Amino acid sequence: MGKLIWLMGPSGSGKDSLLAELRQQEHEQLLIAHRYITRAANAGNENHIALSQQEFFIRAKQNLLALSWYANGFYYGLGIEIDLWLHAGFDVVVNGSRAHLSQAQARYGTSLLPVCLTVSPDILRQRLQTRGRENDAEIAARLERAAHYPPFNCHTVNNDGSLLQSVERLLILMGRKEEHYASL
């Protein structure tokens, strides 16, 4: 059975960039799952599958979603296909939710690897301002929310530096790459 890597972090921490970089690299037995979201396909940077609320509810009713939740005005889901991939021995990386980690832990137990992507408040503010999706009040609210969801019961990857460093750290946590220490 593979591992489900539940990648969490505040909006603007770089989850989508990290997942996009991981998709560009070749890793055997590693898949990045798309989320099903009731948000337009061109909204934001996330590579997701856009569904209407009706489509989402039909999939949920037919047990086609392994996990689902509601946040920020949208419904989010992970397709049941991730269970097939895990049972086939693939490690699966998903863009998870900090608030719904317990739901993932209940379903996947020891197969779950919770990873929190962290970023310093100043860099987070700068990234949110640069992407231009939120106004000042919304940015303040996102910063406040980020402060109330510190990493807990999870491995951390600091994303203040380069994206490639963050990807390397994630691969080390997943056991897909050895950590090399510089000799002193």
UniProtKB/Swiss-Prot annotation:
Pathway: Metabolic intermediate biosynthesis; 5-phospho-alpha-D-ribose 1-diphosphate biosynthesis; 5-phospho-alpha-D-ribose 1-diphosphate from D-ribose 5-phosphate (route II): step 3/3. One of its GO terms (molecular function) is ribose 1,5-bisphosphate phosphokinase activity. ATP binds at G9, P10, S11, G12, S13, G14, K15, D16. It catalyses: alpha-D-ribose 1,5-bisphosphate + ATP = 5-phospho-alpha-D-ribose 1-diphosphate + ADP. Gene3D superfamilies: P-loop containing nucleotide triphosphate hydrolases (3.40.50.300). One of its GO terms (biological process) is organic phosphonate metabolic process. The keyword Nucleotide-binding applies. Its EC number is 2.7.4.23. The keyword Hydrolase does not apply. SMART domains: GuKc. InterPro entries: GK/Ca_channel_bsu (IPR008145), P-loop_NTPase (IPR027417), PhnN (IPR012699). Keywords: ATP-binding, Nucleotide-binding, Transferase. SUPFAM superfamilies: P-loop containing nucleoside triphosphate hydrolases. NCBIfam families: phosphon_PhnN (TIGR02322), PRK10078.1 (NF007485). Catalyzes the phosphorylation of ribose 1,5-bisphosphate to 5-phospho-D-ribosyl alpha-1-diphosphate (PRPP). Belongs to the ribose 1,5-bisphosphokinase family. This is Ribose 1,5-bisphosphate phosphokinase PhnN. It comes from Salmonella arizonae (strain ATCC BAA-731 / CDC346-86 / RSK2980). The lineage of its organism: Bacteria, Pseudomonadati, Pseudomonadota, Gammaproteobacteria, Enterobacterales.
